[in-house]
Amino acid sequence: MYDKGPVPGRNDACWCGSGKKYKKCHSAFDERLERLWEEGWEVLPRTLYKTPADIEGIKRSAAINVGVLDCVGEHIAAGMTTNQIDQMIYDYTVEHGGTPADLNYEGYPKSVCTSINDVVCHGIPCDTDVLHEGDIINVDCSTILDGYFSDSSRMFCIGEVSAERQRLVDVTRASVEAGLAAVKPWLPLSVMAEAVQKTVEDAGFSVVREYGGHGIGKEFHEDPFVGFTTEAPDVDTIMAPGMVFTIEPMVNAGAPDIKISKGDGWCVRTKDGSDSAQCEVQLVVTEDGYELLSW
């Protein structure tokens, strides 16, 4: 059944911290989720829906997260190494009171993932990866502030890029916009996934299946897994107000198949050597749609 935890009395204070009586606040919310669960939909445990205080905490974290990517955008250029990007992100985050969430996460050695051209995700910064004119790169960073996590990534084009690479980046961004437009409370994740998948595949590109978005807030990766195809796991999960997750499709110019580096165990590349792009935003579902938290 729907895990709604301890249920307050109808006249007791609501579990969300609003100060309102439960019957005037989240009583109907809990009842609606329970009905949806009984109908066969997936619903998150109550503890994964964020309270107003949680959202404010995530927003403070996200302000650093957005700021650091703005900083990267101002300085990234041909001739820069990915290690220099990593140092920039570490310095900015720490100077603003945050902690890079990637650093030492499950053994990951850096503060950011830098994924160039055919690298799908989890490229590890180093001194030998030098940006060249015509490259495309995804910079994916995550931030912790006061126990709250934020996460986003952006694509950067280094100088003049080929028409093919520019189109891949543009379609990837458009797929995220299509996904956002499909986010509505009380609908399943599948409607968002379908919008992303259609945008990508109509353009002749493919969506990576093995990686996707995720819930996030008080932990780096929370349920649900957020896939971007209609057959992905958890697509029957209902998007309810207070749910925080990321939309971050990884889009390949060729086939969706990937391979993981046997050397570092992290770097993911396209199996056929085609280019890949990714954009990531973090949002909270609201009563009438969504609010962007980081981008």
Predicted regions and their residues:
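Active-site neighborhoods and metal-handling regions in enzymes and metal-associated proteins
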Residues: 6-10, 18-295
